[in-house]
């Protein structure tokens, strides 16, 4: 699925070339059973998304992991567009770190893309011994022939934002990317851009704080993150810490795809803001708030005010549109970022959420809506939960969405999601004027899985996508 080229490596030469890539036909996504009451391992599902296929919207393969309660979460590749110039590299393995068990699974997606096989299991003890890290999150491939995985904590569940390095051929644990003793206080996501000698990482909370659910007292106690860490890419050390105003729980971070661009965006979940980070003329980095989703005053909920809870963000490959999900309020949003300092709302669509009519929550004061949104019903299925993980087609015309965040928080905020399972939906995107419209004929119902309702999470295409591939 690479650009046509006589001597090319994986992926595409540029983000704009990637936009010309083939339409997605299958999608991989992890399905979680931890906290659901079903004593079964998490598994990697393969879903057919080709409208011409007789198996359209069906799970066509399930690869169960050999252990229980891993909490599969995010995934990355053995190699991607960062290695486009190396014809010896090919995108054949999907790397799945486990958020809770700290196990890493390497899945063979190259031999038979529609019938995946487990290639290797990296046990937690190997990571603990060589890296003193645990609770693993984001996986990115590097042009150096390595895979880099971020951590949330140490072996005891205290906060520690470090990075595990794997050999991308043998998948042996090589050690940490950062210098010994140089980890950030907390960790979560990261994105690198070698042209500017920079990596920036984000932070959630220590594993001991978030493992079993959300306690508002932990926010008051300052146990949740509110910083970005700027790293020197060549020296592997933190050179700047950016404190975020109105930036509690900065989660997903995205540089612009154009590797010359020295700016990007991060979604701050609890504050429900989008912050733009950028490089100054002097070479240091700054951050500014560019979008604020106002909280809603409510009755019948955990707190008197409900944040949107921005949990995932994406940038289209042409760096024109930014998308994000408000998991609690229930809406997906599209912003035109042609002027990155002044994003302009161009599309909004409600996909479930906590404030739907007829639910337990009453909205008392709302700065944005005149009435509470209707519950979403697709093909007879009432959608539980709210929009969470999102993935955009290469051409930018289709947005896929799942509804599970993290099993412990799902159980707390959306107990019906545990009972009924999550769903995968597809939204049609207007890339000319802007706009979002639900495809009423698309539904993958993970409530009907053979072993019981499952929680489906992050989406990946076999040929790469706009949140896994980094151009250098």
Curated annotation (Swiss-Prot):
It is a peripheral membrane protein. SUPFAM superfamilies: 3-carboxy-cis,cis-mucoante lactonizing enzyme. The modification N-acetylalanine is found at residue 2. The modification Phosphoserine is found at residues 111, 371, 467. Its EC number is 1.8.3.4. It is an enzyme of class 1 (oxidoreductase). It is found in: Nucleus; Cytoplasm, Cytosol; Membrane. One of its GO terms (cellular component) is membrane. One of its GO terms (biological process) is protein transport. It holds the Pfam family SBP56. The keyword Magnesium does not apply. The N-terminus is blocked. GO terms for molecular function: methanethiol oxidase activity; selenium binding. It catalyses: methanethiol + O2 + H2O = hydrogen sulfide + formaldehyde + H2O2 + H(+). Coiled coil: none annotated. Keywords: Acetylation, Cytoplasm, Membrane, Nucleus, Oxidoreductase, Phosphoprotein, Protein transport, Selenium, Transport. It comes from the Eukaryota. The keyword Oxidoreductase applies. InterPro entries: Se-bd. Pathway: Organosulfur degradation. PANTHER family: METHANETHIOL OXIDASE (PTHR23300:SF0). Catalyzes the oxidation of methanethiol, an organosulfur compound known to be produced in substantial amounts by gut bacteria. Selenium-binding protein which may be involved in the sensing of reactive xenobiotics in the cytoplasm. May be involved in intra-Golgi protein transport. Interacts with USP33. Belongs to the selenium-binding protein family. This is Methanethiol oxidase. It comes from Pongo abelii (Sumatran orangutan). The gene is SELENBP1.
